[in-house]
Amino acid sequence: MHQTSGSILSPSDVNNLVGIKPTVGLTSRYLVIPISEHQDTVGPMARSVKDAAYLLQAIAGVDPNDNYTLAIPNNGSIPDYVAACDYSALAGKRIGVAWNVIDIYGPIDEPVMTAFMESVALIERAGATIVDANFTAFPEYVQDNNETLVLNADFLTNLATYLSELSYNPNNVTDLQDVRDFTHNFTAEDWPDRDTAVWDDALDNQGWNNTDPRFWAAYQANLYYGGEGGILGALDRENVSAVLLPTQLSPGIPALVGSPVITVPMGFYPADWNVTYNRRNTLVETGPKVPFGLSFMGRKFDEATLIGLAYAYEQRTMHRNDVQPYIIPNIELGDFVK
């Protein structure tokens, strides 16, 4: 799965899955339809931490077609992520909680907060020391627009590069303007009911890409909000191995600096919870037995540590099994790849 700012973590959160959003550069994005070279990453969604570790082991590594992968430490050597699945991984660790993110984003639904507090207590009982690890610049970040500027600017450049590499392009679309024109004129795209507001903002309101001098200031602001004032600063300042948040709150800050996150099932809404829908009234957002997850956020290229911590939590809780799915696939991938 491809994530820019939530597309691994968010669906994993509400589908009772483990999801690993890797460090930007740990896995290749070559020929993945891009949004942002600074935030895009490819990672696994799976039923267990160990399954996700196996998948990450298979897809991580240097690719000459994606120069971001040249940043992988130790000359591109990949750790043994499966071996990192250690029941005792929480023992002796310092684990942070970004309480100010919860306070600022709040109020959080009571079932999620109750499960989160129980998870923090369980992690402490497993031998970890729990400390406050706030994101000091988070109050400024939530009022800031630089992330949108960076994503728009990257998208204008990166999409054109991707389209130029296609060997088959029957409609001769070469940039975002062409893609928007095609979308507006192709009936099956259901425009304007399904709008192109994000593209319109990039093209009509912003109008500059990541080669523009204005890009650098916006990008540096992002690095501050995600770095010293965000997850990286919290990790170093409090000397912790990971920072915890409910997964619904975790994607944004690590995305700014390309740092890794793993989400693990943490619980479910109760059976009598009222159904709430998205703004189009077409998808359930919360409701009876809808799952939610716990995120472990860490340092760049330190996925092995996060996998160990997540595995130790998962094996003590096994929340995935608390509710049985309505539909269970009767075909396994292994049936075809053996």
For the regions a language model picked out, list residue spans one by one:
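Acidic helix-start/capping segments at beta-turn-to-alpha-helix junctions
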Residues: 135-149, 332-334
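Short helix-loop capping/hinge segments that flank enzyme active sites or metal/cofactor-binding pockets
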Residues: 89-100, 150-226, 273-294
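Structural helix-boundary/capping segments
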Residues: 2-99, 117, 121-122, 161-168, ...
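Acyltransferase
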Residues: 108-136, 158-169, 220-237
